[in-house]
Amino acid sequence: MKKVFARKYMVVFEREEHDEFVVYNTKKEWEEGHTHIHTYKQAMYLVDCILNNKIPKKVNKYFLVSLQRLSTSKKYKEQIQRRLDGDTKEEYYNRPKYYRK
């Protein structure tokens, strides 16, 4: 494997024999902190989402599971799990200002 890109604690390797990329979080063990991605563009997007705690809307289930696998933040993992379960957001009701407590 050849190291292609690194930013903070995220590293992207290229596996030439399988024509794919491996994204690895150095804060985790190898077994639970890496994922395989087919394109360099997807690998870069995965790193960007992890570092900025973004949850993309139009991605497949494998991408969301990869985000969950690479993340170290418990809150971020819970948000991704809600998206995987089908719940998009937490329930929120904006009370009017004139509402009596």
Label every PLM stretch briefly.
Residues 25-30, 34-56:
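A short, charged, amphipathic alpha-helix used as a generic interaction element across diverse proteins
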